[in-house]
Amino acid sequence: MAAVTDVQRLQARVEELERWVYGPGGSRGSRKVADGLVKVQVALGNIASKRERVKVLYKKIEDLIKYLDPEYIDRIALPDASKLQFILAEEQFILSQVALLEQVEALVPMLDSTHIKAVPEHAARLQRLAQIHIQQQDQCVEITEESKALLEEYNKTTMLLSKQFVQWDELLCQLEAAKQVKPVEE
C-alpha cells in the first residue's frame, strides 16, 4: 500500500517537473521526461559497453566509493605490532594527556563547591553591576570632556587677564614716566 502511494507521489512529481520544463500547455509531442532519461541511460550503457576504458573507470569509481567510506578503515585489521608502534610513537603525548587528566580530576571537587554552584544567582547581580559600570564610564567621559572645556576656558581667561595686566602695567609705567618727566614747579 505504501509502495503504491510512493509511486503515485513520484509520478505526480514527474508530471509537475514536465509542466515546469514544457510549460502549462502540456508536453510537446507527447514526449515525457522519464522517456528521455531512459534513452540517455541506454545510450550511456551502450557507449560504456563498447569502451574498455569506461568499464575500468566504472570499476575504479566503485573502489573509490568503497575507500571513501569511513567504516572501511575500521574494517581493515592492523597487526598488533603496528598498533604497538603507534602507541610507542605517541607515548610522551599520552603521558602528558594523562597528567592533565589527573589534574582535572583533582579539580573536580572545586567544580562541585557551593561557590561555583551559586554562579547563576550572581549572574544577575553581575549584569546589573556591569550596566552601572558602563554608565559610570560614560559619565566619566562626559565629565572629562566638560573638565577639558572648563580648563580651556580658564586658560583663555587667564591669558586675557595676563594681557590686560601687562597693558595696564605698560600704561601705568608710561604715566609714571610722564609724571617724572614734568619739570617740578617750585
From Swiss-Prot:
GO CC list: centrosome; cleavage furrow; cytoplasm; dynactin complex; kinetochore; midbody; spindle
GO biological process: cytoskeleton-dependent cytokinesis
Main location: cytoplasm
Origin superkingdom: Eukaryota
Coiled coil regions in record: 135-157
Location of this chain's protein in the cell: Cytoplasm; Cytoplasm, Cytoskeleton, Microtubule organizing center, Centrosome; Chromosome, Centromere, Kinetochore; Cytoplasm, Cytoskeleton, Spindle
Alphabetized InterPro entries for the sequence: DCTN3
Keywords: Acetylation, Cell cycle, Cell division, Centromere, Chromosome, Coiled coil, Cytoplasm, Cytoskeleton, Kinetochore, Mitosis
Modified residues (N-acetylalanine): 2
PANTHER family linked to this entry: DYNACTIN SUBUNIT 3
Family: Belongs to the dynactin subunit 3 family.
Known partners and oligomeric status: Subunit of dynactin, a multiprotein complex part of a tripartite complex with dynein and a adapter, such as BICDL1, BICD2 or HOOK3. The dynactin complex is built around ACTR1A/ACTB filament and consists of an actin-related filament composed of a shoulder domain, a pointed end and a barbed end. Its length is defined by its flexible shoulder domain. The soulder is composed of 2 DCTN1 subunits, 4 DCTN2 and 2 DCTN3. The 4 DCNT2 (via N-terminus) bind the ACTR1A filament and act as molecular rulers to determine the length. The pointed end is important for binding dynein-dynactin cargo adapters.
Functional note: Part of the dynactin complex that activates the molecular motor dynein for ultra-processive transport along microtubules. Together with dynein may be involved in spindle assembly and cytokinesis.
Name under which the protein is recorded: Dynactin subunit 3
Organism of derivation: Bos taurus
Gene: DCTN3
